């Protein structure tokens, strides 16, 4: 229908169009100066020292795990309540994903669940900053230090998220996403920030065929026309078109996230009169980026299942999302790990629903959602 309200819509405008035109007019449209500007801007945003732009957060996860030397016989701990790309990258490198449970109300991976899963084969811990809120980084980094295990933060939902006064990605290594539904987007893209210069160098090489420099380095730096392959790598570089759009979006981040926060506050107020349960907020000091606004639809409490609620909203012209179906319940992982049970993850996976939340939502859009929820709840 023409008036369908989507679950998400990117906030694009004249600034993004002008950014693309600038790249077109420059004559250099692949990875180049706009990538360098984006990397510098993300270092300023996060407070970290190095940033490497990539074609997607999935690509960033792949080469980050490769740079750590993850491979056959290794284990990597991650929550099952995450997008499956993380699990896929672990498996494709020959390692074993060790999926752990989350807190029932915040859906954050907990230090207790992580520590219980550590073995001599554990080579990395990947906490997820879920829905725009931060995981408990102090406790997780303390675990990593105690056991000598690297931490890679999945910050795909966390552009604009802060933990105890510092932006996510301020220390260690974190991977952000610029996918179309994220808080800032360039359609597809991502960036890895890190405080380790050797690690950053490995990422730069792995993202571009294993070469020591990319085409822009050779063009602008007067390097030798044929670069040297240091080790086999991939084609995960980000075109300057995308980088320019991401830069334009980054300049709007505070305003975009402020609007998200205002809509989330309205949702919380409205939920007081409805049977649907929003996620709880983490107790530690933080700034929430409100990438998602998630409710739990428990049939015993709400008189309707999550799937039925989503179908009913669709008939009313309202889109929703599911973030996420637990990874260990997906066909491949269910067959590979048939005895794995994660009670709180599974309880939420069957009940969570993401409501429409994007900066260009109008008050009329919001009222439509709340009116529909009241109608479905029989109020």
Swiss-Prot record:
User: Where are residues bearing N6-(pyridoxal phosphate)lysine located in the sequence?
Assistant: 182
What's a single GO CC term here?
membrane
Its GO biological process terms?
lipid A biosynthetic process; lipopolysaccharide biosynthetic process; response to antibiotic
Record's superkingdom?
Answer: Bacteria
User: Which InterPro entries does the record cross-reference, listed alphabetically?
Assistant: ArnB_NH2Trfase, DegT/StrS_aminotransferase, PyrdxlP-dep_Trfase, PyrdxlP-dep_Trfase_major, PyrdxlP-dep_Trfase_small
* Cofactor(s) of this protein: pyridoxal 5'-phosphate
Could you tell me the EC number(s) of this protein?
Answer: 2.6.1.87
Q: In which pathway does it act?
A: Nucleotide-sugar biosynthesis; UDP-4-deoxy-4-formamido-beta-L-arabinose biosynthesis; UDP-4-deoxy-4-formamido-beta-L-arabinose from UDP-alpha-D-glucuronate: step 2/3; Bacterial outer membrane biogenesis; lipopolysaccharide biosynthesis
**Which UniProt keywords are present, listed alphabetically?**
Aminotransferase, Antibiotic resistance, Lipid A biosynthesis, Lipid biosynthesis, Lipid metabolism, Lipopolysaccharide biosynthesis, Pyridoxal phosphate, Transferase
Q: Which reaction does it catalyse?
A: UDP-4-amino-4-deoxy-beta-L-arabinose + 2-oxoglutarate = UDP-beta-L-threo-pentopyranos-4-ulose + L-glutamate
Molecular function, one GO term: UDP-4-amino-4-deoxy-L-arabinose aminotransferase
Q: Which Gene3D superfamilies match?
A: Aspartate Aminotransferase, domain 1, Type I PLP-dependent aspartate aminotransferase-like (Major domain)
Q: Which Pfam families match?
A: DegT_DnrJ_EryC1
* Top-rank EC class of the record's enzyme: transferase
| NCBIfam families in the cross-refs | PRK11658.1 (NF008658)
Give the protein's function. Answer: Catalyzes the conversion of UDP-4-keto-arabinose (UDP-Ara4O) to UDP-4-amino-4-deoxy-L-arabinose (UDP-L-Ara4N). The modified arabinose is attached to lipid A and is required for resistance to polymyxin and cationic antimicrobial peptides.
* Subunit structure comment from the entry: Homodimer.
State the family named in the UniProt similarity comment for this chain. Belongs to the DegT/DnrJ/EryC1 family. ArnB subfamily.
HAMAP family in alphabetical order: ArnB_transfer (MF_01167)
Instruction: Name it.
Output: UDP-4-amino-4-deoxy-L-arabinose--oxoglutarate aminotransferase
